[in-house]
C-alpha cells in the first residue's frame, strides 16, 4: 500500500515483517514503524480518504483483511476485543513517541540498542523468541532508515555492540546474551509497551 492510495480494509499481519515509511521524491526514506506478526496496520484506516504514508514488506507476509463491518460487529458485541484494539492504538502512539525520542536525543549506539530491545520485547510478547534468540530479517539499510543514521554508521555501531558482547547477529537471527546489559546500553525502559495490560485483563473469553 502506497501513499495516496485509498484505504479499504485494515491489514492484520499473520506472519512476516513489514514497515510503515515516508519517502521523498529523490528516494530518501524514513521508516517510522515496524510491523511484526500479530500487529494491525493502521486501525480504522478506512475512515481516511487516502493514505499519508506507505506500507512495505520486509519479508514475505501473510495478512488478513479486516473489513469495516468486522470492526462494527466487534465494537457492538465484543467489548473486551474492542478494548484490546484501543490498547493497541495507545501502545502504537507510545511507541511513536519513543521513536521520536530515539531520533532526537539518543546517541547512535543508544538508538540501535534501544530499537533492538524494543523488537526483542515485542517478539517475546508474541511468543516468537527462542530463549535469547529471535528472527531478525532487518538489513543495515532498514536500521539506517529507522534510526536516522547512515549505513556506514549503523555498521560501525553494530560492530561496537558485537565487540561488547551485547548482541550476536548470525544471518537473520539476533541473539541477546544479556538483555539487561543491552537495555542499559540503549537506556531502554519497557514501560511504554504497556505489557502489563496484556493477558487476562483483555481476554475476550472472560
Feature annotation, model-predicted:
Residues 33-98:
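Cyclic-nucleotide recognition modules
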Residues 15, 37, 60, 68, ...:
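ATP/adenylate-binding site constellation spanning eukaryotic-like Ser/Thr protein kinases
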Amino acid at each position: 500500500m502506497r501513499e495516496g492510495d485509498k484505504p479499504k480494509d485494515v491489514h492484520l499481519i499473520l506472519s512476516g515483517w513489514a514497515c510503515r515509511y515516508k519517502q521523498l521524491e529523490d528516494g530518501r526514506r524514513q521508516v517510522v514503524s515496524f510491523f511484526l506478526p500479530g500487529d494491525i496496520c493502521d486501525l480504522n484506516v478506512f475512515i481516511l480518504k487516502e493514505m499519508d504514508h506507505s506500507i512495505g514488506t520486509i519479508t514475505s507476509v501473510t495478512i488478513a483483511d479486516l473489513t469495516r463491518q468486522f470492526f462494527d460487529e466487534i465494537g457492538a458485541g465484543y467489548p473486551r476485543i474492542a478494548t484490546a484494539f484501543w490498547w493497541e492504538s495507545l501502545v502504537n502512539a507510545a511507541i511513536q513517541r519513543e521513536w521520536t525520542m530515539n531520533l532526537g536525543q539518543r546517541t547512535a549506539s543508544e538508538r540501535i540498542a534501544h530499537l533492538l530491545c524494543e523488537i526483542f520485547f515485542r517478539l517475546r510478547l508474541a511468543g516468537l523468541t527462542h530463549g535469547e534468540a529471535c528472527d531478525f530479517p532487518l538489513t543495515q539499510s532498514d536500521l539506517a532508515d529507522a534510526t536516522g543514521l547512515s549505513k556506514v554508521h549503523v555498521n560501525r555501531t553494530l560492530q561496537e555492540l558485537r565487540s561488547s558482547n551485547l548482541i550476536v547477529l548470525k544471518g537473520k537471527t539476533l541473539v541477546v546474551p544479556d538483555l539487561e546489559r543491552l537495555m542499559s546500553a540503549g537506556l531502554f525502559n519497557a514501560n511504554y509497551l504497556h505489557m502489563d495490560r496484556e493477558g487476562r485483563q483483555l481476554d475476550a473469553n472472560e
